[in-house]
C-alpha cells in the first residue's frame, strides 16, 4: 500500500472508528468518497489549511452533511482548525467540535451548515455567483485577486431533492464555470436501491442544464478523479458535473454496496474486517501511522504557499491600484452607513399613503447608493416586490458585475443561494418573494437562522390585503412561523418611518436574518411613528390618562385601524393607548423597564389586532385580553371588502375593546 492509498484509508478508518465509538452516524459516504476528498484537497484545492478563512480559498461544501466524518477526518489529518484526535473521538457528543452534521461557525473549516439534502448544492451555487460578481468588481488585467473554485459533493439524495434542479438549472443558465459538482453515485438510498424511486439519467439532465459532464467509472481511481477535475477546470464557459461511481461503505465486506452502510455504525466486528480488508497496518482504534501524518503535514505546508503567492499578488495590486484597497476594505469589512442612517432624507416622513413594499423599494435604492456591495433579487417577482436596484445592472452570463439577481420561479434555490452569497463574504444580500410563498423558503431560512447569517428576506403581499387573488395568495400562518424561528427577526412596518427602521436594522444586524413583511395596499403615514420601531414595540398614540383604560396592540396595516378605533373610543369616554409592534423579537429583547413602560402590568385590558394568525399574541394580551385575527383562510375579493368581512374594522375593534373593559 503506497502513501496515497494509506492517506485515503486513514480517512476511512478514522470515520469508521469515530462512528462506532459514538454508536451513531453515517459511515457509507466517508468510506465511499474518501478518494474524491483526498485527491481534491491534496492536489487541486487552492486552499491553505493553516488559514481556512483566506478569502481567495477554494470552497468545498459537503452537501451530504450526514457524511460529516469525511470532513472531520480531513480536518484532523490536514491540521485544519487544529482539530484534535480527541475531538474526532468525541464525534456526535454534546459540546464537541464534531457534531453530527457540519455546522458553520462551530467547526473551523466548515463552509456551510448542511444536512437537509440539496441545500448545500444551492449554497455552493451562491458562493460561485459571489466569486463571479466580486471578480468582475475587483480583478484587473494581470491581477486576478478574486479567482477561486467552488466544489460541492452530494449523492443520490441531493439529486432527488427539487432544490438541486432549481439551483443547477440557474447555474447552467449563468454559465458559472468555476462551479464543480461531484455526484457521489452509489445507487443506494435509505430504503434500498435507487431503482425503487430514482431511475432518471442524471448526466443527461445536467447536460440539459448547460453543464459539462464528466464520468469517473471507478471511485477509487485517484488518477481518473484528478483528470476529471482538471477537465472540469479547463471549461471556461460552463459549470461541470463530475459523476463518480462509488461503492457505499467501501472496504467493509458485510456492508459495502448495501443500504445498511448508510446510516448506522458498521459494528465492532465489521470495523475490524474493514481494516483487515483494506490492509490497514494498525489494529487499535483511531490509530494512524506517523508516516501518514507526516505526509499530510507536508501537503499542508505546500498548500499554504498558495496564500503566500496570493498575498504577494494582492500587495502589488493595491500598490498599482490604491483606490481599490479602500473599495476592498469596504466590501469585506463593511461600509460605514452612519451618514445615511443619520440623514434627514432617510427618515423623512411620507406625505401620502403608500404601500410599504413601495416604500421599501425606495429605501433599498438609497441603501444601494451608500453600500455598493448590496446584491439581491426576487423569484421572478421584482416588479411586485419592488426590489429592482436602479442602474445596477442585471447579473447574467454576460454581466457578472450586475447587482440585480434574477432567480426565476425558484424560491427554494433563491433562499439557499442567498445563504451562499452571505457565506462567501464581501456582499450584503437580500432575496424576495410573496409572503405566502415563504413556505417554499422556510427550510432554507431555517439554515440562515441556524448559521446566524445576516441575509435579508423581503416578503410582500402580507395579508388578506392581497384581495382578488384569493386564499392561495393570502398569507395567514406564515408570520407566526417566522416569528417562531429562533434568531430570525421579523419586521411588519406600518408606514415609511417603520420601514426605514426595518431596513436600518437589517443592514446593521450582523447576527441572524431579518424578514421585512410588507403590504401590497397603500397605508397612511402615521403621525406617531418613530425610530422607536427599532425597539420592536412602542407607544404610537398614547392616552391622556396616566393609566389607560385599555391597550390596543397592532402591527403593519392594522396600526392605523387601531389609531382610528382609539379616536372613536374617546367619543365614548374610553381612553386607550395604541402600541405599534412591528417586531416581537426586538421588543422581547428590551429591558424589563422599557417593556413595562409600553405594556404596564397594571393594564390587563388589552386587544391585539393583526390580519394574520393569532398565534403568539396571547403572551402580550394575556388571559384577560382578546385578539382580532384571522381564524381561517382568506377569500377572493376587493381588499376593503375582505377586511370588513373578517372583522378588521373600526367598529369591531371598538366593540372588542368595550367587551374587554366590560
Question: Where are the predicted features?
Answer:
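Cofactor-binding active-site loop characterized by glycine-rich and histidine/acidic residues
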Residues: 33-174, 388-389, 421
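Non-catalytic terminal/interface segments that mediate subunit docking, oligomerization
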Residues: 312-439, 443-454, 530-539, 547, ...
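Acidic-glycine-rich active-site phosphate/pyrophosphate-binding loop
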Residues: 1-13, 45-47, 84-106, 382-396, ...
Amino acid at each position: 500500500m503506497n502513501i496515497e492509498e494509506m492517506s485515503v484509508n486513514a480517512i476511512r478508518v478514522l470515520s469508521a472508528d469515530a462512528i462506532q465509538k459514538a454508536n451513531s452516524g453515517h459511515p457509507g459516504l466517508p468510506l465511499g468518497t474518501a478518494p474524491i476528498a483526498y485527491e481534491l484537497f491534496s492536489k487541486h484545492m487552492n486552499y491553505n489549511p493553516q488559514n481556512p478563512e483566506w478569502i481567495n480559498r477554494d470552497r468545498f461544501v459537503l452537501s451530504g452533511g450526514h457524511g460529516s466524518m469525511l470532513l472531520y477526518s480531513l480536518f484532523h489529518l490536514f491540521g485544519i482548525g487544529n482539530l484534535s484526535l480527541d475531538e474526532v473521538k468525541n464525534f456526535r457528543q454534546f459540546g464537541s467540535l464534531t457534531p453530527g452534521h457540519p455546522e458553520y461557525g462551530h467547526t473551523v473549516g466548515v463552509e456551510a451548515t448542511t444536512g437537509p439534502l440539496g441545500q448545500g448544492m444551492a449554497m455552493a451555487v451562491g458562493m460561485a455567483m459571489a466569486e463571479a460578481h466580486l471578480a468582475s468588481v475587483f480583478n484587473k488585467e494581470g491581477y486576478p485577486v478574486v479567482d477561486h473554485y467552488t466544489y460541492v459533493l452530494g449523492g443520490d439524495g441531493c439529486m432527488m431533492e427539487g432544490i438541486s434542479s432549481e439551483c443547477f438549472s440557474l447555474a447552467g443558465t449563468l454559465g458559472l464555470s468555476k462551479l464543480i459538482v461531484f455526484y457521489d453515485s452509489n445507487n443506494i438510498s435509505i430504503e434500498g436501491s435507487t431503482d425503487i424511486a430514482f431511475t432518471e439519467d442524471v448526466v443527461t439532465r445536467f447536460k440539459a442544464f448547460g453543464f459539462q459532464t464528466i464520468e469517473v467509472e471507478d471511485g477509487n481511481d485517484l488518477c481518473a478523479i484528478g483528470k476529471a477535475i482538471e477537465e472540469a477546470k479547463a471549461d471556461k464557459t460552463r459549470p461541470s458535473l463530475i459523476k463518480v461511481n462509488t461503492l457505499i461503505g467501501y472496504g467493509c465486506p458485510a456492508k459495502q454496496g448495501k443500504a445498511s452502510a448508510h446510516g448506522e455504525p458498521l459494528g465492532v466486528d465489521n470495523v475490524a474486517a474493514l481494516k483487515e480488508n483494506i490492509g490497514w497496518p494498525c489494529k487499535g482504534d483511531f490509530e494512524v501511522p506517523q508516516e501518514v501524518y507526516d505526509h499530510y503535514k507536508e501537503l499542508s505546508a505546500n498548500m499554504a504557499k498558495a496564500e503566500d503567492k496570493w498575498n504577494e499578488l494582492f500587495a502589488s495590486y493595491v500598490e498599482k491600484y490604491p483606490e481599490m484597497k479602500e473599495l476592498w476594505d469596504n466590501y469585506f469589512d463593511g461600509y460605514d452607513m452612519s451618514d445615511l442612517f443619520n440623514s434627514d432624507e432617510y427618515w423623512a416622513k411620507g406625505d401620502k399613503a403608500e404601500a410599504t413594499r413601495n416604500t421599501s423599494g425606495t429605501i433599498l435604492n438609497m441603501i444601494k447608493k451608500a453600500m455598493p456591495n448590496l446584491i439581491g433579487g426576487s423569484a421572478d417577482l421584482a416588479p411586485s416586490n419592488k426590489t429592482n436596484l436602479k442602474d445596477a445592472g442585471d447579473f447574467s452570463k454576460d454581466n457578472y458585475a450586475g447587482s440585480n439577481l434574477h432567480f426565476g420561479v425558484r424560491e427554494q434555490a433563491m433562499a439557499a443561494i442567498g445563504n451562499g452569497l452571505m457565506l462567501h463574504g464581501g456582499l450584503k444580500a437580500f432575496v424576495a418573494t410573496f409572503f405566502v410563498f415563504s413556505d417554499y423558503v422556510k427550510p432554507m431560512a431555517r439554515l440562515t437562522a441556524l448559521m446566524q447569517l445576516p441575509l435579508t428576506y423581503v416578503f410582500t403581499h402580507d395579508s388578506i390585503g392581497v384581495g382578488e387573488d384569493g386564499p392561495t395568495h393570502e398569507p395567514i400562518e406564515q408570520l407566526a412561523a417566522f416569528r417562531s424561528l429562533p434568531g430570525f427577526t421579523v419586521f411588519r412596518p406600518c408606514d415609511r418611518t417603520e420601514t426605514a427602521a426595518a431596513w436600518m436594522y437589517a443592514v446593521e444586524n450582523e447576527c441572524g436574518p431579518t424578514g421585512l413583511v410588507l403590504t401590497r395596499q397603500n397605508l397612511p403615514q402615521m403621525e406617531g411613528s418613530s425610530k422607536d420601531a427599532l425597539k420592536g414595540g412602542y407607544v404610537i398614540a398614547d392616552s391622556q390618562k396616566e393609566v389607560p383604560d385599555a391597550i390596543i396592540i397592532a402591527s403593519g396595516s392594522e396600526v392605523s385601524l387601531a389609531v382610528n378605533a382609539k379616536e372613536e373610543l374617546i367619543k365614548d369616554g374610553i381612553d386607550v393607548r395604541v402600541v405599534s409592534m412591528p417586531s416581537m423579537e426586538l421588543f422581547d429583547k428590551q429591558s424589563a423597564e422599557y417593556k413595562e413602560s409600553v405594556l404596564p402590568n397594571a393594564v390587563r385590558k388589552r386587544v391585539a389586532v393583526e390580519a394574520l394568525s393569532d398565534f403568539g399574541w396571547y403572551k402580550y394580551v394575556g388571559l384577560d385580553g382578546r385578539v382580532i385575527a384571522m381564524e381561517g383562510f382568506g377569500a377572493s375579493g376587493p381588499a376593503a371588502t375582505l377586511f370588513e368581512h373578517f372583522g378588521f374594522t373600526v367598529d369591531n375593534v371598538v366593540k372588542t375593546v368595550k367587551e374587554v373593559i366590560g
